[in-house]
Design a protein with these regions (language model features):
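P-loop NTPase catalytic cores that bind/hydrolyze ATP
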Residues: 115, 206-254, 303-310, 371-379, ...
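Short acidic, hydrophobic short linear motifs in intrinsically disordered regions
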Residues: 62-65, 72-97, 184-222, 318-366
Length: 514
């Protein structure tokens, strides 16, 4: 930002003398012209002893405000500063002479202003351009450094562990494997807007570990503004380049699909996490089920919002339960502008779905920013595996952003929040089983690529407690059309079951091969 000299250069003489009077520096400034007076006063104000003395004499509210500025890196947007401290009254020479506001400041902002400890400028700070309140750099150098970062200062109280927990684990990754097999085995049609054909969407939804209710499926899933788990899954599949569209039909791309399927489960989950972090197609704010974002004259930055918020989540100790509302309140206290870095709350046209009035102004923070945080906690952060949540009266389907009390950061979430993949020594997967009734059972812990290959030559039957597929004539004909003979199917099943293929199943496949 600016030095004291740069800050004071454009001040009128009356304001410069008011600052000198407030700091008790009248005897050190004698120049008559504004430019010369600004140079003299800035030199006096920059004296380290004078700065330390001025800070020590500040009232507690002003010291707290100055510490907040230091903690923010020495600058914050003028709207954000005004919410904390109030506005500095402005007036010409006659008003200054009459009111003498430095003798009776009405708020902490005026105290710091007339002490020459802050300035105001239109500038670019941290990539954000706007009106900023700042501490001049030659003052900032002599102020105590912030003892904690914004994120570390959340200090959430502990909460008791809930009776029932929704464990996130690798559930979305398991459903991603289901998605890939579904696209491979079916003629999935997509319209120009990216929405799937209703019948395809319903068939895929049926196979998921957490299928959506029919009403939610018709209203949201697959749409560009759908705020449900299935919509996120489809968005991430597109972002990871798993398919292309040809003549309206989705066709799996072998290289990216195989690469993901053959990765270890922790790496698969991490790839989905990274795709969400970088996604501009998935705008979390516009996916909040109860909010409607309207108008084209404003734009939010979903990627920047995620990254700023995750800095705070990274300071939470994994495995410890906290109340959701305590986290929301802590973000409001310490970083309310996490998605509106300019601090302006009057330019985004957002309303609740059942109301016509727009939520303009900081007084609606809880209805917009708070709603976004609650959606992220119960939605993407949980679906992707970064948070476990309280399952009491709570589901994983389209309306699942309703009441929940507590959350905890998972071990893999802690690694991701630190910018690292999650390294874990997973136990060996349970074996795939083929039964005499031609059912094939694939445990959730099985390798994703093995399950994908099972799905290519079978018919899906169930996804819980294990994945269950059935060897059928229709499925074998589909596999044969893709170049997979019955002999290859038998060889594969023997390999993944350690040779335990029932004799009748083996004979049936051998007969088809001959």
């Amino acid at each position: 930002m600016l030095t004291l000299t740069q800050t004071l250069t454009d001040y009128p003489v009356s304001l410069l003398r008011a600052i000198a009077d407030a700091r008790g520096l009248q005897s050190l400034v004698h120049a008559a012209t504004p430019a010369a007076l600004a140079v003299e006063l800035s030199a006096a104000l920059a004296d380290p002893g004078s700065i330390v003395d001025a800070v020590e004499r500040l009232p507690e509210t002003a010291q707290t405000l100055l510490a907040a500025l230091v903690q923010a890196g020495g600058a914050m947007t003028a709207p954000s500063f005004a919410r904390l401290a109030g506005e500095v009254r402005q007036g010409g020479p006659a008003w200054l002479a009459r009111e003498q506001p430095w003798l009776a400041p009405i708020n902490a902002a005026e105290v710091l202003w007339y002490q020459g400890l802050i300035g105001r400028a239109f500038a670019t700070v941290g990539g954000e351009t706007g009106d900023f309140i700042f501490v001049p750099v030659d003052v900032l150098a002599w102020l105590p450094s912030a003892s904690v970062t914004t994120g570390a200062s959340l200090q959430l109280p502990l909460a008791p562990a809930p009776g029932t927990v929704h464990l996130s684990s690798y559930r979305l990754a398991l459903d991603a494997g289901t998605l890939l097999a579904f696209v491979q085995n079916n003629e999935v049609m997509q319209d120009p807007t990216g929405r799937w054909r209703a019948a395809d969407l319903a068939a895929l939804n049926q196979q998921l570990l957490a299928p959506l209710p029919e009403a939610s499926l018709k209203g949201a899933a697959g749409a560009t503004d759908g705020g449900d788990r299935l919509s996120l899954l489809l968005t991430l599949g597109q972002a990871l380049g798993w398919w292309r569209t040809h003549g309206g039909r989705l066709r799996l791309l072998a290289t990216p699909a195989r690469s993901w399927l053959q990765a270890p489960a922790p790496d698969q989950a991490h790839a989905l996490w990274q795709a969400w972090l970088a996604s501009t197609e998935w705008d979390d704010l516009r996916r909040v089920p109860d909010l409607r974002c309207e108008g084209s004259g404003w734009r939010n930055d979903a990627v920047a919002t995620r990254r700023r918020l995750l800095v705070h989540l990274a300071t939470i100790r994994p495995g410890v339960w906290h109340r959701r509302e305590d986290l929301v309140a802590a973000i409001r206290r310490h970083d309310p502008d996490f998605q509106r870095s300019d601090g302006i709350y009057t330019t985004w046209y957002i309303r609740r779905s059942h109301e016509s009035t727009y939520l303009l102004g900081f007084e609606h923070w809880n209805e917009v920013e708070g709603a976004l945080l609650r959606f992220l906690i119960a939605g993407p952060l949980h679906w992707l595996g970064a948070l476990d949540i309280d399952a009491s009266g709570h589901g994983e389907t389209a309306g699942e952003h309703g009441p929940l009390d507590t959350l905890r950061v998972t071990s893999q979430g802690a690694a991701w929040l630190a910018g690292q993949p999650h390294r874990v020594n997973a136990p060996p997967p349970a074996p795939i089983r083929v039964e005499a009734d031609f059912n094939v059972y694939v445990p959730h812990s099985a390798a994703a690529f093995d399950r994908f290959r099972v799905a290519r030559c079978t018919q899906w039957e169930a996804s819980q407690p294990d994945f269950r597929y059935r060897i059928t004539q229709t499925a074998l004909r589909r596999a044969a059309a893709g170049g997979i003979t019955a002999g290859r199917v038998l060889a594969f099943l023997r390999a993944v079951t350690q040779g335990h293929v029932p004799a009748n199943v083996a004979r049936a496949l051998e007969n088809l091969e001959s």
